[in-house]
Amino acid sequence: MTNQAEEKRILIMAGGTGGHVFPALAVAKYLSQQGWKVRWLGTAERMEARLVPQHGFDIDFIDIKGVRGNGLMRKLAAPFKILRSVMQARAVIKSFKPDVVMGMGGFASGPGGVAAKLSGIPLVLHEQNAIPGMTNRLLSRIASEVLCAFEGTFTDIKAETVGNPIRKELIALGDKRESCCDDDSLKVLVVGGSLGAKIFNDVMPSVLEGVSKTHSMTVWHQVGRDNLVAVKAEYQRLGQDGSVSVAEFIDDMEAAYRWADVVVCRSGALTVSELAAVGLPSLLVPYPHAVDDHQTKNAKVLVNAGAAFLLPQPIVDTSKLMTKLSMLASDKQELCNMGQRARDVAILDATERVANVCIRLAEKG
């Protein structure tokens, strides 16, 4: 069922979170520049429905909502809903005739992966996290190629470590990053995701107040939706509003990374890979409710390299963060060393590696 036209085609399944969608977009853009026709498979309610068309790619939707749940009726209905979504995915494959199907996570990957296998189309999986999700664990048994971002992600099957595809602008930023702390003030970027991280919003105003008594420190704090007024008021109450920029969202992360000397953040897979690529030291506070605690495993990639500090959320307080940031403010050379160690573990050609696997499978026919 391989497409006989000269133009190669790929159907990409990635959705739900930016950690799935953005790496997939990097691969999609690369293959598109190589003359490939790219189409997406996702769900209408998740972020891929908005993001993918914004980047110029067509998307088809399958209906798999309601599969998860604890109610008896949902459990009884689940097999039928999964079967229906597989049939919907097969219809897309029959119409589009891809040479390769690639799954990078999200609800559509499961049905789409099964449909690819039933249709005789090569299936490539890419796992972004250091611990594989349930869908990729199951699909890995039927995939043509299994790829992962971090060494040791899959322990019972053959998998190739290729890194996480990230935007080429961030790789270029890391290439240009020649020094850190080029002035006296320690510049701290605090990123809590689109909803913010309550722990950061609660403690960072006091951290800035405490560190500023002995060191010069400025903060760029992304607080998330609906948190701007309260967090800004707390910085102001503590007399720190002149040393902080508070924003609900940071649209230009390239500019934020360029500005920062150190980052305080969660440890999602894409974040960890971006920190490595741009060569930034970090204080990582894994999201404690992540499935299988995969963010802690992600963080250890940088921590074990000496590029980051791991701070489990239950022990995070003003004192802990003050101690770490004061230490870095006092030792600029170590700050630079940590940034270099982060860069040393980066896999900078991840996009090309993933794309080349797809190209190789398509050429095999």
From Swiss-Prot:
Family annotation (Gene3D superfamilies): Glycogen Phosphorylase B (3.40.50.2000)
InterPro entries the record matches: GlcNAc_MurG, Glyco_trans_28_C, GlycoTrans_28_N
Membrane association type: Peripheral membrane protein
Entries under CDD domains matching the protein: GT28_MurG
Biological process (GO), any one: cell wall organization
Family membership noted in the UniProt record: Belongs to the glycosyltransferase 28 family. MurG subfamily.
Protein known as: UDP-N-acetylglucosamine--N-acetylmuramyl-(pentapeptide) pyrophosphoryl-undecaprenol N-acetylglucosamine transferase
Species per Swiss-Prot/TrEMBL record: Shewanella pealeana (strain ATCC 700345 / ANG-SQ1)
